[in-house]
Amino acid sequence: MVEVKKHKFPGVYVVIDDDGSEKIATKNLVPGQRVYGERVIKWEGEEYRIWNPHRSKLGAAIVNGLKNFPIKPGKSVLYLGIASGTTASHVSDIVGWEGKIYGIEFSPRVLRELVPIVEERRNIIPILGDATKPEEYRALVTKVDVIFEDVAQPTQAKILIDNAKAYLKRGGYGMIAVKSRSIDVTKEPEQVFKEVERELSEYFEVIERLNLEPYEKDHALFVVRKP
């Protein structure tokens, strides 16, 4: 017998499977819609989408014991590197119809894959843009509560800082998935993460850092706050 209970983070759920194993899930904002072939559970008249940590760095962070999760129902999120919307679809479930996601993606081909998803998920606003040039989408994005960044570039810390200066409310939060090999392949991941933390701390208060192994190799997730 499958059972669903609330996670400590609002909008996130825990599915207890027949074998007793636990998986995280979100309540489907668009019942009947699958985004990336994920498993769907029906429980007490609601539909829940299993959040696969192997396909989502944010999902991996929650499974790995993330302590600070500023994405909540009703919040506005600037998502840098939204890609085809795997993680963003779960964020969409969490923020709900009262919230919104501005999804920045550099690749027109990848953004096209998002179109059928956002036709029904009206709380996702896809924007073709370059996250290294936040001024490019100034006319389309308002101040937000949270910025989530998943952009594999050497300057990824600077990208978060520049976007936070333009779009993050005071007291708002940033979350960034850092891939050490994208920054410097010659250095040990731990050294890269320390350098990123130092760079982030020049502008933000760094609240948490979490390793994403075994789901993502040489990745860490940072949670920061804008003073």
Swiss-Prot record:
Family the entry assigns: Belongs to the methyltransferase superfamily. Fibrillarin family.
Keyword RNA-binding recorded: yes
Record-annotated disulphide pairs: none
Name recorded for this polypeptide: Fibrillarin-like rRNA/tRNA 2'-O-methyltransferase
EC number(s) per entry: 2.1.1.-
Functional summary from the UniProt entry: Involved in pre-rRNA and tRNA processing. Utilizes the methyl donor S-adenosyl-L-methionine to catalyze the site-specific 2'-hydroxyl methylation of ribose moieties in rRNA and tRNA. Site specificity is provided by a guide RNA that base pairs with the substrate. Methylation occurs at a characteristic distance from the sequence involved in base pairing with the guide RNA.
Subunit relationships: Interacts with nop5. Component of box C/D small ribonucleoprotein (sRNP) particles that contain rpl7ae, FlpA and nop5, plus a guide RNA. These sRNP particles form homodimers, giving rise to an asymmetric holoenzyme.
Enzyme class: transferase
Biological process, per Gene Ontology: box C/D sno(s)RNA 3'-end processing; tRNA processing
Pfam family of the protein (one): Fibrillarin
UniProt keyword terms in alphabetical order: Methyltransferase, RNA-binding, rRNA processing, Transferase, tRNA processing
